[in-house]
UniProtKB/Swiss-Prot annotation:
Keyword annotations of the record: Ribonucleoprotein, Ribosomal protein, RNA-binding, rRNA-binding
UniProt record similarity statement: Belongs to the universal ribosomal protein uL6 family.
Identification of the protein by name: Large ribosomal subunit protein uL6
A Gene Ontology biological process term: cytoplasmic translation
NCBIfam families: PRK05518.1 (NF004037), uL6_arch (TIGR03653)
């Protein structure tokens, strides 16, 4: 089976976005938003030329081919994050005991979940904002991984353990991920 001598992925840089590559660190900036990420793997080189980010690998193995595609996705998500941002929508569901959800500082507090006396908490990652309005929770930010992790933290905080989830359906559930309805 013939092997490719060179793998080259190119990513267009929009006009209002600035991409800087310093060693292994890729920095993407647009306006006030900036994301940095260390991308280092032996044999893979990242550079900018003619308004494009170029990821190259000569005589790649399977793992290096996969890593090139992964880095392309990471950089594309960074560019999308600083230009448009990412938004997850969660919905609050309860049958009998109304939950009170609020976001303060870097935590989301959930009171009266299934009539419990204690407060459940979920961590908000850096650079992520959480807005609670009625029975909807909106998680938004520039870093896709941090926004997704914050939404998952909120969803996991209302996980019912030791009960049949077909009956006890109270909780906070993700209904939209970065524009995709679930």
């Amino acid at each position: 089976m013939p092997v490719a001598a060179l793998i080259r992925e190119e990513i267009e840089i929009p006009e209002n976005v600035n991409v800087e590559i310093n060693g292994n660190t890729v920095a993407v900036k647009s306006g006030a938003k900036e994301l940095r990420r260390d991308l280092m793997y032996p044999g893979i080189e990242i550079s900018t030329e003619d308004g494009k980010v170029v990821i190259e690998c000569t005589f790649p193995r399977k793992v290096q081919t996969a890593i090139v595609g992964t880095y392309r996705s990471h950089i594309q998500n960074m560019i999308t994050g600083v230009t448009d941002g990412f938004e997850y929508k969660l919905v609050i569901r309860y049958a009998h005991f109304p939950m009170k959800v609020s976001a303060k500082g870097n935590t989301v507090t959930i009171d009266n979940f299934l009539g419990e006396k204690y407060t459940r908490t979920a961590k908000i990652m850096d650079g992520v904002t959480v807005k609670v309005s009625g029975e909807e929770v909106i998680v938004s930010g520039a870093n896709k991984e941090f926004v997704g992790q914050t939404a998952a933290n909120i969803e996991q905080a209302t996980k019912v353990k030791g009960r049949d989830t077909r009956i006890f359906q109270d909780g906070i559930y993700i209904v939209e991920k970065a524009g995709k309805v679930l």
